[in-house]
Structures are given as structure tokens and as C-alpha cells.
């Protein structure tokens, strides 16, 4: 992975003999920025248009993630394996510079691409058959002054755990999100009744970096809208804001020298040498969960670690681990129709990978294993486990990768409230009914960025 190939934009280096590609990309981008500059800009590389002022430019990138899943007992009948091809993500990245210290990001996402035929067990619906709506995912004004003082304003990722800041494209495994979702993930929308989407929210992030004793410390503090509630419906009747922060300590290589802002990756395929990063993060919003009758503060504490070692034979060992603790709504809120209910409890996930040094064909193989444990404070029957083993075929880092893996868990409800966990009260009203059905799944997937 080259240094300039980030999740926000991929600057394409095109030789003179590929002039046709320069013209194609430049033409598409110029349609987006026509009238924004008073003079016709020069094209120096495919995907980037620059004016005579090197601080003024605009770049275009894109990424897709598509997969095939065969899931046990997930068919419409509930008794057969379900077999589904899906487009999980389809994004267009637009980045630009206006001044030496002022930049912007505008990214889109196919929000309903993973909706198959209008929904689970549902018929095809409207909106391009229910699976193709494109929309805004990032809109960020960036004021980047020094290593220590920077501000991002607009719609951006909430600075919490590494798993969130990796986004879907910069995990070392294809499906990085197996622990319970945060507030801005689970809501799926903005405005009244929503708390953000895709890990994003509208707000301001202050971040920077210092280098004590040859190490590297990243800090990020932020304030966001968080959950909004309508009058008489939902917990946040006082329109309180959400606060989030992350503190990351890199003891070896300075990984943030290669990442945009406070964003992260799940590893670097050995491109930046040895990496050891320890981090803590958290969120808080008063009356951020629960219901009108039973509001509660939303609180999280998260710790994560990344260790990557380049071995003597040029193979690369990568290790990720993450611990999350959620304090959310009371048990009484689950029976309220207006409850913004979330997972309440602890989770832990860890995975290890080894990238072989030998190139076979056009890429290198990377086997891995993963374990996830989730335990709700209200769930009947205790915690639940999930095991995953897989193989990546890495062609060009995060920009071109094939994956195949097998997953086994003790419940099939997915990660939104924790794998296998539900939000349904038991008959006595003393706990939540578990989804204890065993579930296996096989997935083959492709990820591309350019």
C-alpha cells in the first residue's frame, strides 16, 4: 500500500503511455468542479486536477466491496442454507484543497446496496428495487494547521475505537464489524430519532499529535449532535450533545504519518515497519439512550491494540484486539415503543494474521483466525462466542484483495445488538430472550479501490 493511497482518496499515478486514462478521469472530475476555478487547471496525474497554485486541487477515487454468502438456516423457510451475492459497499471519494491549510472531503455510499430485494423475506420494492440508493456519507471541512492543532468540521467518523476508524475498507479482515455497534452505527439516520449513520455524525473534531521520547501520541476530542428525539417521543428531550475522544500511543512506527487525520487501519502489510499502538476511547451523551419514560445516559469505554511485526523472512505478523464496555438503557425501557435501545454489556474481539513473503501469481496469501465474545448484562443464558477462520489473497494492500472465510457463532442475530443478542423481553420481563440457534456461514469476497 502506497503512502498516498488512503480511504478518502486514491491518487492514481499514470504514465504518459496511459494518457487515455488521464483524459477519462479528468473529464469526469471536471464535470463536478466546472465553474469552481477561474482558469482551466492542468492535469498532472490521473484522478487529480491541479491549478497553477499547488495548494488548489481536486481528486477522485472510488471503491467497491462485493461478496457471496452461504448461511446456514437463513433461507426464507428458515430450514435451508441461504445463498446470496451482494454489493456491500460502493463509494465515490472526492477530495480537494482550497488553501495550504484548508481542504475538504465529499464521499458517497450506496446505502441500500446490501438490501436484497427490499429486505429480509420481503418482495422487491421501489427505490431501484430497494438496493441501489446513493447518498452522502462524508462532508468534511478540514482546517489542518500543524501537527498539534487541527479541526475537521461537518459529517465525519466519531473518534472511538480502531475498528470504527478503519471503516470497512481498511480492516485486515473483510467483515471487521462483529462486536456491538455504537450509537452512530445502529441508528441508521440523522435528524429526529436518529444518531448518525455508518459511524458518522455531524460535529467538530479537534485532533493532533505529539512525539514524547521518540514515541507518538495521537489525541482526538470531539462534540457531535448524537441522538435527537422528537417532542414527547424518545429519551433526549433536552437536546444534549454527544462527546467522544480517543488517545492513541504508538511506541514504534508513527502510523499516523501515513493516515488521513485521526483515521486508522487494521495493519499495514509491513509497509511501515514494526507497529505497536495502544489506545483508549469513549463516548458520552446524557439521555442518549432509552425512551421518553425511561431515559438513560449513553456511555462507552473502549481499549484497543495493534501490533505488526515484519519478520526476518519479510513475512508480516499482524495482531488486533479490542475490548468494549457499554452502559445504556435500563431493562424497563425495552418495553417502550419509543425506545432507542442498544446493547448493554461487554464485548471482546481479537484476530491474528500472517502474510507470507512469497508472491504467488499476482498476490500473497494471508491466513488468519478470529475470536469474538459478547456478553449482555440483561441476556438470559450468559455470553456467546463466535469463531472465524479465513484466507486473504492480497494483490495490492487494501486496494485489491480477495477473501474467503468460514464463521461459526452461537446465535444468528448479527452484530447490531451483539451477535446472537436480541432486544425482546422474556415472558417474566426479567431479561432478554437469547437467539441461541447455532449458525455457520461461508463467505467469499472482493475488495477494490482506485
Language-model-detected regions and their locations in the chain:
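C-terminal segment of classical bacterial N-terminal signal peptides
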Residues: 32-42
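Extracytoplasmic loops and strand-loop junctions of Gram-negative outer membrane beta-barrel proteins
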Residues: 74-77, 121-124, 184-190, 286-290, ...
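Predominantly the C-terminal beta-signal and adjacent terminal strand-loop region
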Residues: 398-444, 449
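Detector for outer-membrane/organellar transmembrane beta-barrel domains
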Residues: 52-53, 238, 248-377, 385-387, ...
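N-terminal secretory signal peptides that target proteins for export/translocation
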Residues: 1-20
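Sec-dependent N-terminal signal peptides
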Residues: 20-33
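Short glycine-rich, acidic/polar surface loops and turns
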Residues: 388-392
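Outer membrane beta-barrel
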Residues: 46-229, 235-255, 259, 342-358, ...
Amino acid at each position: 500500500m502506497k503512502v498516498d493511497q488512503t480511504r478518502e482518496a486514491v491518487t492514481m499515478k499514470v504514465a504518459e503511455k496511459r494518457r487515455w486514462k488521464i483524459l477519462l478521469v479528468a473529464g469526469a472530475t471536471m464535470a463536478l468542479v466546472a465553474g469552481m476555478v477561474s482558469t482551466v487547471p492542468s492535469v498532472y496525474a490521473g484522478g487529480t486536477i491541479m491549478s497553477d497554485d499547488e495548494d488548489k486541487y481536486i481528486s477522485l477515487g472510488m471503491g467497491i466491496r462485493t461478496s457471496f454468502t452461504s448461511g446456514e438456516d437463513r433461507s426464507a423457510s428458515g430450514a435451508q442454507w441461504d445463498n446470496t451475492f451482494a454489493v456491500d459497499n460502493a463509494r465515490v471519494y472526492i477530495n480537494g484543497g482550497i488553501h495550504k491549510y484548508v481542504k475538504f472531503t465529499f464521499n458517497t455510499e450506496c446505502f441500500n446496496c446490501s438490501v436484497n430485494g427490499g429486505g429480509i423475506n420481503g418482495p422487491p420494492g421501489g427505490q431501484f428495487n430497494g438496493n441501489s440508493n446513493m447518498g452522502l456519507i462524508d462532508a468534511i471541512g478540514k482546517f489542518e494547521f500543524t501537527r498539534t492543532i487541527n479541526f475537521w468540521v461537518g459529517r465525519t467518523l466519531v473518534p472511538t475505537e480502531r475498528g470504527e476508524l478503519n471503516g470497512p475498507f481498511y480492516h485486515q479482515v473483510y467483515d471487521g464489524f462483529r462486536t456491538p455497534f455504537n450509537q452512530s452505527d445502529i441508528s441508521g439516520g440523522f435528524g429526529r430519532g436518529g444518531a448518525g449513520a455508518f459511524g458518522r455524525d455531524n460535529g467538530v473534531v479537534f485532533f493532533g499529535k505529539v512525539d514524547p521520547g521518540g514515541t507518538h501520541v495521537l489525541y482526538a476530542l470531539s462534540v457531535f449532535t448524537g441522538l435527537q428525539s422528537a417532542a414527547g417521543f424518545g429519551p433526549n428531550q433536552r437536546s444534549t450533545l454527544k462527546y467522544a475522544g480517543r488517545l492513541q500511543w504508538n511506541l514504534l512506527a508513527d502510523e499516523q504519518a501515513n493516515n488521513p487525520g485521526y483515521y486508522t487501519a487494521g495493519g499495514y502489510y509491513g509497509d511501515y515497519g514494526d507497529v505497536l499502538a495502544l489506545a483508549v476511547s469513549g463516548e458520552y451523551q446524557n439521555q442518549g439512550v432509552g425512551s421518553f419514560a425511561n431515559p438513560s445516559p449513553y456511555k462507552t469505554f473502549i481499549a484497543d491494540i495493534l501490533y505488526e511485526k515484519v519478520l526476518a523472512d519479510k513475512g508480516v505478523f499482524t495482531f488486533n484486539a479490542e475490548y468494549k464496555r457499554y452502559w445504556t438503557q435500563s431493562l424497563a425501557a425495552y418495553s417502550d415503543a419509543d425506545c432507542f435501545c442498544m446493547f448493554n454489556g461487554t464485548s471482546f474481539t481479537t484476530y491474528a494474521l500472517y502474510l507470507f513473503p512469497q508472491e504467488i501469481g499476482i498476490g500473497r496469501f494471508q491466513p488468519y483466525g478470529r475470536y469474538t465474545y459478547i456478553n449482555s448484562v440483561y441476556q438470559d443464558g450468559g455470553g456467546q462466542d463466535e469463531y472465524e477462520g479465513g484466507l486473504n489473497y492480497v494483490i495490492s494492500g487494501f486496494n485489491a484483495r480477495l477473501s474467503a472465510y468460514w464463521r461459526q457463532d452461537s446465535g444468528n442475530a448479527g452484530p447490531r445488538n451483539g451477535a446472537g443478542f436480541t432486544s425482546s423481553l422474556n415472558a417474566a420481563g426479567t431479561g432478554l430472550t437469547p437467539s441461541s440457534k447455532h449458525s455457520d456461514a461461508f463467505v467469499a469476497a472482493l475488495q477494490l479501490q482506485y
